[in-house]
């Protein structure tokens, strides 16, 4: 059967009227049958662990492992890593090694996890096992950087979900992409190949297979000029467009919240339109949190989930009091109404800060969020120590207060201890309580709080900030990767972004009584209506990108090439908005080629105006090669490039010495024969 013509201007047909296999011919990927099984994955991991155990017998400096010219992770070592995957051949498509090497990144991350477990259980060798874990991550990054086949790297190595047999039980399938994020392996996440894969996932050029939940596939429609191909509700699943939609809905949510909080009348009336919309938004977001947690599990929980859940709890309390006020009368109604709006007002800081959740894909905001999250985690230790100290002193003060058989100052004591944390307390607060015992005890409390605990907090914050700033770029990459996977891990086949998930909830009972094809059609048209404004933007954006992608494929370069027109390369760049002389894409491609040719011709003419200006570029390149440091050659033999030339000269002298020794032996034999 012929492949669906994506360039055809098809009508907006529902999924049931389109051949699924042909239409999903717009995607193509790797079949799971051509990937190693769980037992084979375990053997590959064991081989890699044996290799790393041998090459890291003692503790080296981390720089000797992570540096780009590492003498430890030399080319022969990386060749052994490939051999550890098994199979025959050199990794080319069609060989068995091609099949097994696709799991190398996953296996290396799994080995890294094993080393982390060993470091935790065997504290005496903690540093050695941590270094081996670092080595496994570094090798994984090297494997990613060395792979030049985009499809193989993205689909087989990073996105495919592999499973490993541990103690006779197959573990839950997970991809190297997801494992790196869950392990927070910034070394792997920061590699260029990994980031390109994340970029393709973010743009929807890589999507999950509709037939195999463990595989991802390339979206062929990225280069299509068909309006129908891009004006499809399924494209809402793209993380980029989900993020845009969520930002837009969050701004609306914030505007409605502001209207409700700041226009509240003293007269307690019924729930108005804006309150109704606010409450529906809130219910939709809470429902979405429950569904995602149910499907994804504990991996879904994070800093922002705790932040949002706290805000939703406050809003839920406000809604409950508001509903109670409507159903009450007299003074009770007024009281509940006041409580409702006062609680609602307390959610304002969280509501505004929530916008950062959707803006963290931008580097400035993202780096700031990473620092904030790290500092909040470091604060846990401080607050634990603070809690223990406060409880201890609280018990002491209460004991002093009750020494006369009466308990009269418990509330004042507790308030004073808490106020001391924020600097709002004084020594006079305890001056009248069982002198001089309470005063002496309070001096100790103030000393411990201000001199010891506060300095611990400052040190923790300083360490956290320094660690993040030093590795800010990779930490930002990790944040974006986590955000992208958060969208991709969403379980919905039909994506209804809150509060539109309430519509899905209302129409779900219909699916119990109609056929599967009819249910698909209903969801298709519902999403087509509610998302039509965004789909218009998506279509415009993707049609613009499609022209550049077609140009890249014509030139034989990756789809994401020529996105930036650099000043030093006259042949790169592509103006997506240029209409060309004709409507056909080939007219635009020919026009761009003509522009490049003309620019190169003008450049050469300008260079040749002075005959003495030109140099022999071939000879110039050879001279450059002669003075370049032998980094590549040193890596091949596993030595530091700084001593490579010395070692090379020693090797030459050794060879000459061996020749002299051999000639002397031959001469000695001849003399003995003559004698």
Swiss-Prot record:
Record key words, sorted: Calcium, Calcium channel, Calcium transport, Coiled coil, Ion channel, Ion transport, Membrane, Stress response, Transmembrane, Transmembrane helix, Transport, Vacuole, Virulence
Entry's induction text: Expression is down-regulated in response to alkaline pH when CRZ1 or RIM101 are deleted.
GO BP: any one term: flocculation
Bilayer-crossing regions: 244-264, 271-291, 301-321, 355-375, 380-400, 440-460, 495-515, 518-538
Keyword Transcription: no
GO MF: calcium channel activity; calcium-activated cation channel activity; potassium channel activity; sodium channel activity; voltage-gated monoatomic ion channel activity
Topology of this chain in the membrane: Multi-pass membrane protein
Main location: membrane
Gene deletion effect: Leads to hypersensitivity to oxidative stress, increased sensitivity to killing by macrophages, reduced ability to invade epithelium cells, and attenuated virulence in a mouse model. Shows defects in hyphal maintenance, hyphal growth and flocculation. Prevents the localization of the Spitzenkoerper to hyphal tips. Enhances mitochondrial depolarization and apoptosis.
InterPro entries: LHD_YVC1, TRP_calcium_channel, YVC1_C
Cellular component GO terms, alphabetical: fungal-type vacuole membrane; plasma membrane; vacuole-mitochondrion membrane contact site
Coiled coil stretches, renumbered: 644-675
Keyword Ion transport on entry: yes
Role: Vacuolar calcium channel involved in the release of calcium ions from the vacuole in response to hyperosmotic or alkaline stress. Required for activation of CAP1-related transcription of oxidative stress response (OSR) genes, but also for maintaining the stability of both the mitochondria and the vacuole in a potassium- and calcium-dependent manner. Contributes to pathogenicity. Plays a key role in hyphal polarized growth and re-orientation to host-signals through its contribution to the localization of the Spitzenkoerper to the hyphal tips.
Family: Belongs to the transient receptor (TC 1.A.4) family.
UniProt cross-references to PANTHER family, sorted A to Z: ION TRANSPORT DOMAIN-CONTAINING PROTEIN (PTHR35859:SF5), NONSELECTIVE CATION CHANNEL PROTEIN (PTHR35859)
Name recorded for this polypeptide: Calcium channel YVC1
Underlying gene: YVC1
